[in-house]
């Protein structure tokens, strides 16, 4: 059978023959373009794997010079280190982990391309500041060998210039502008350092506030002095719950003044969020932190604030996600970023316990927070003997937070079997706070648990209701706390749980976990 081509086949063949053939040059150009495209994709993949777009993570050793330089006390060296951290975070956008000594084991940092270990060696020369330091990149650390430090010997300069020079000569490029965080007048700067050192030890807070307040008058354009004064005032008011409401608006105004001068300053936003959370307004606290995080997406402190506010609102998945993101940026194994109470509420006891390790020189150690929560954890586990030891230790610290000292003493008396004496002290403390709209609903639930341990169910129920009214809305802990077990058969308890669930549901709708990924 003979196949005869159809007309349309012939026309297609004729058309294809009439088309011009691509030239050799065009083929070569096409091949070159394809190679460039494939190469570009490969390079982008390789850079992504190496983390070129990753944030710089800085491990900052803050107090190395204190032991060898008599011109700086340990607290002053740490205060200068904290100010260096603020400069690196605010101007560089870096994720900074602050430690007090070079880690004995550097394996965690070894091979990390975008990790910088930096040891400060500040010195005071008259009114000038010398910000010398040494650094080594994580990728340069070799197993079994001492770090190959690069030394930066600084010149003694007026303090503000010293900070600007540090940023200008930093191993990673930082956009340098005149600092808004360090006072330009040397005398004001050294007053600020002394006030910050007292804050770190929880000592002489009224004197520290007087120094900081004088600094705001002398240098009203310096954001750092306003933020420090707000920080000091916040700490002072927490020690005096009766004055919290009266002082809250003034403290907020101080921090907001700092934020106007230094928009998006992480520490100021964090402190302002604590004020909002402690007064039961976690919604505003979370809005503030999420907004600040748009400017500072790699800041661990902002994520700590989100975890704190979310925990108080009962948003445990959001709090846990914030903690995970924070620990990806900071080196939590070198220095816990916070007492991770969230993990106690979720049942992750080992992680909570890991956040309670001592940090010599840190406020969490000197304030009594760490031994108090070690005692609290032991109590949750049913180890009353260990709990008794830890509460006694917390109650005897010379510079502990007053609220921690008093509550530790009450728990100590309960576990010693002196319940009547404990009840009297607890009632006295309770009466001091009634009608004062005391801050911190989470602390109030600890008072409810103390009443329950003593056996006063009516007072415990009243205090648990007050904790809810003060903003502590973590339904899961109300339901899981072993100390609150005696209340769970009371009619008022079921009504309280219903109110908790309703409020928590509204907050869950407003702040889904995915917000952190979008933010």
Language-model segments: residues:
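A structural "domain/chain start" motif
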Residues: 40-79
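Alpha-helical tetratricopeptide repeat
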Residues: 184-200, 223, 227, 266, ...
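Hydrophobic membrane-insertion alpha-helices, especially the h-region
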Residues: 29-42
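Catalytic-center loop of serine/cysteine hydrolases
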Residues: 81, 87, 102-198, 203-207
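Alpha-helical protein-protein interaction modules
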Residues: 206, 281, 286, 290-293, ...
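N-terminal intrinsically disordered, acidic low-complexity segments at the extreme N-terminus
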Residues: 1-19
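Short coil/turn linking the two alpha-helices of tandem helical-hairpin repeats
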Residues: 195-203, 230, 235-242, 279-280, ...
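N-terminal segment of the mature soluble domain
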Residues: 71-103
